[in-house]
Swiss-Prot record:
GO molecular function: metal ion binding; monooxygenase activity
Any one Gene Ontology cellular component term annotated for this protein: extracellular region
Name the UniProt record assigns to this protein: AA9 family lytic polysaccharide monooxygenase D
Organism: Botryotinia fuckeliana (strain B05.10)
Compartments where found: Secreted
Presence of keyword Oxidoreductase: yes
UniProt cross-references to InterPro entries, sorted A to Z: AA9, AA9_LPMO
Induction and repression of expression: Expression is increased 4-fold in cellulose-inducible conditions (in Avicel- and wheat bran-containing complex medium).
Keyword Nuclease assigned: no
Length: 246
């Protein structure tokens, strides 16, 4: 784990910490499971035991983001210096996964969920080799001009994604992401907040769709990344690969 990258004054982090959130837990098959908690970083530094969760370790201690100029780096996969979780939650194909954010302040931007089949243990898979399939996406409601992030905020900072019923059983990583677009009018102004959770999928599905590497999801000049969100929109191209619905 690249812990040394976070050894800077905590006081400098306070404004950002108060502003953004992260996925602190999920509900799958109706069961709540805690995810990675920022406080665990301090436990690691202080050599204090902390709970093992299906949420991946990551080093965004300031609750910061991955900027467009980092889209080709491994940080876009599961956030900054992410490291595999050692345990997994479970969900049935056709069921739902509820992603619970600690908080969220920005009501402009899409919400997306991807899955990647580990092809074995998700605790040891190389994140750079994962191929991702987008199973959920939501942009803006053109009738109300309410963005998906606004809907998430109104729903107690929670988002629910349905697992395609035809998805083959296996060991998966779910990648849930908000793209904050309040700064999208300027180059490198979008903010990506990806978080990963190990979830085993059960069921009788047989579909194993081909995925793509996370480092190829987005470009800094994509029309859904660099544009003016402060006008009435009648169209919006959600960033990333095509949605797979099963």
């Amino acid at each position: 784990m690249h812990l040394l990258s976070l050894l800077f004054p905590v006081i400098a982090l306070i404004p950002t910490v108060l502003s953004h959130g992260y996925v602190s837990g999920i509900v799958a098959n109706g069961v709540y499971t805690a995810g990675w908690q920022v406080s665990y970083w301090y436990d690691i530094i202080n050599k204090v035991p902390y709970p093992q969760t299906p949420g991946w370790y990551e080093e965004a201690l300031d609750l910061g983001f991955v900027a467009p100029d980092q889209y080709s780096t491994s940080d876009i996969i599961c956030h900054k210096n992410a490291v595999n979780a050692n345990v997994s939650a479970t969900v049935a194909a056709g069921g739902t996964v509820q992603f619970q954010w600690t908080t969220w302040p920005h009501n402009i931007g899409p919400v997306l969920t991807y899955v990647a089949n580990c092809g074995g243990s998700c605790s040891t898979v190389n994140k750079n080799n994962l191929k991702w399939v987008k199973i959920d996406q939501s942009g803006i409601n053109f009738s109300t001009q309410v963005w998906a992030t606004g809907a998430l905020m109104a729903n107690n900072n929670t988002w629910t994604s349905t697992v395609p019923k035809t998805l083959a059983a296996g060991h998966y990583i779910f990648r849930h992401e908000i793209i904050a677009l309040h700064g999208a009018t300027t180059a490198n102004g979008a903010q990506n907040y990806p978080f990963c959770v190990n979830i085993d999928v059960t069921g009788s599905g047989t579909a194993s769709p081909a995925g793509v590497a996370a480092t190829s999801f987005y470009k800094a000049t994509d029309p859904g990344i660099l544009f003016n969100p402060y006008v009435t929109l009648s169209n919006y191209t959600i960033p990333g690969p095509a949605l797979w619905t099963g």
